[in-house]
A protein has these predicted regions:
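Mid-length scaffold segments of soluble, non-membrane domains
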Residues: 65-112
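A near-ubiquitous, low-amplitude feature marking generic local secondary-structure context
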Residues: 7, 57-59, 108
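Positively charged n-region of N-terminal signal peptides that target proteins for export
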Residues: 1-4
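Bacterial N-terminal signal peptides
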Residues: 7-18
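Primarily secretory-pathway and cell-envelope proteins
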Residues: 22-62, 98, 113-168
Length: 168
């Protein structure tokens, strides 16, 4: 009995005296859809606008990794057709490129490393850019559609960017 009391006191003391454990945030959010004979997934970090208008702060010619803290990754079990370009199955980085004010492009890169260079571009397709949507505080990337074609829908703040793709 005495041993149980001592064990309980030591256990309670160690818990009360232990530094707080901060849990890591869960996995990055994902957009996913079945396409053709496989699945397509987009995984990204999810920044908040916090009162900022980040999209309007971008300069023409700049690239945006479409997320926070890490690259946005497209994983596909099937080859994809973006515009006239076939992107092989596998993992790739997604970026948005502001070619000029109001003119956006979706860029798919070979690498999933940290640094992007234009030489790694596999495909570039126009993004449809729309303003005036209801405010979305947290960046959201969704894959809408199934069967043979789908659309990547990016919403953040009052903006919406979209690009269509299909199985090859």
């Amino acid at each position: 009995m005495k041993e149980r009391v001592i064990t309980a006191i030591l256990l309670i003391g160690s818990v009360l005296g232990a530094p707080p454990v901060l849990s890591a945030q869960g996995p990055n959010p994902r957009g996913e859809t079945a396409l053709g004979e496989g699945e397509v997934i987009v995984e990204y970090g999810r920044p908040s606008t916090r009162g900022r208008d980040m999209i309007s702060m971008m300069r023409p010619g700049s690239y945006w990794r479409l997320g926070a803290d890490t690259n946005t990754v497209l994983e596909s079990e099937v080859p994809l057709l973006l515009g006239d370009t076939t992107v092989p199955a596998g993992s790739h980085i997604l970026l948005a490129h502001l070619a000029e004010p109001g003119q956006w492009e979706l860029v798919v890169c070979k690498s999933v490393g940290d640094n992007f260079t234009p030489q790694e571009t596999l495909a570039t397709v126009p993004l449809t850019f729309e303003e005036g949507h209801p405010h979305v505080e947290l960046l959201t990337l969704n894959l809408e559609g199934s069967g043979e074609s789908a659309m990547l829908v990016i919403t953040w703040g009052a903006y919406r960017l979209t690009a269509s793709f299909s199985t090859d």
